[in-house]
UniProtKB/Swiss-Prot annotation:
Domain of life: Eukaryota
Protein name: Lymphocyte antigen 6H
Cystine residue pairs: C28-C52, C31-C40, C45-C73, C77-C104, C105-C110
Organism (species): Bos taurus (Bovine)
Record domain UPAR/Ly6: where: 26-91
Signal peptide: 1-25
GO cellular component: plasma membrane; side of membrane; synapse
PANTHER family membership: LYMPHOCYTE ANTIGEN 6H
UniProt lineage: Eukaryota, Metazoa, Chordata, Craniata, Vertebrata
Length: 140
């Protein structure tokens, strides 16, 4: 039989393995000029992309408050702002024809609808950590 210290170390290593997420690129919602965010789809970003961005373009003069949504991966929030606040669009923005809002975040799918619940691996890890002391005391 293994000594209690070895069981404890094994339990810690197993919990760390279950709670860690695999190394991968950032995932963001992706869509262009849609009026309905449900039309966006998850996309794995390029390794150089560090943020998920959402850009709302609205027509403030419209009684319906027409808008379009763009969601994407990006290397930085500044890059997105430079792109959408380019010289071409600035004429429309300054004249009040368009309003542009940019929001950036750094977690997987953070630019989409809030996700309910937790990862099954995180739940398994939490269960293992909460049952760990009982398993150690139970012994062989």
């Amino acid at each position: 039989m293994l000594p209690a210290a070895m069981k404890g170390l094994g339990l810690v290593l197993l919990a760390a393995l279950l709670c860690s997420s695999p190394a991968h690129g950032l995932w963001c919602q992706d869509c262009t000029l849609t009026t309905n965010s449900s039309h966006c789809t998850p996309k794995q970003c390029h390794p150089s992309d560090t943020v998920c961005a959402t850009v709302w373009i609205t027509d403030p003069s419209s009684s319906r408050k027409d808008h379009s949504v763009n969601k994407m991966c990006a290397s930085s929030c500044d890059f997105v702002k430079r792109h959408f606040f380019s010289d071409y669009l600035m004429g429309f923005i300054n004249s009040g024809i368009l309003k542009v809002d940019v929001d950036c975040c750094e977690k997987d799918l953070c630019n989409g609808v809030a996700q309910a619940g937790l990862s099954p691996w995180a739940l398994a890890g939490g269960l293992l950590l909460s049952l760990g002391p009982a398993l150690l005391w139970a012994g062989p």
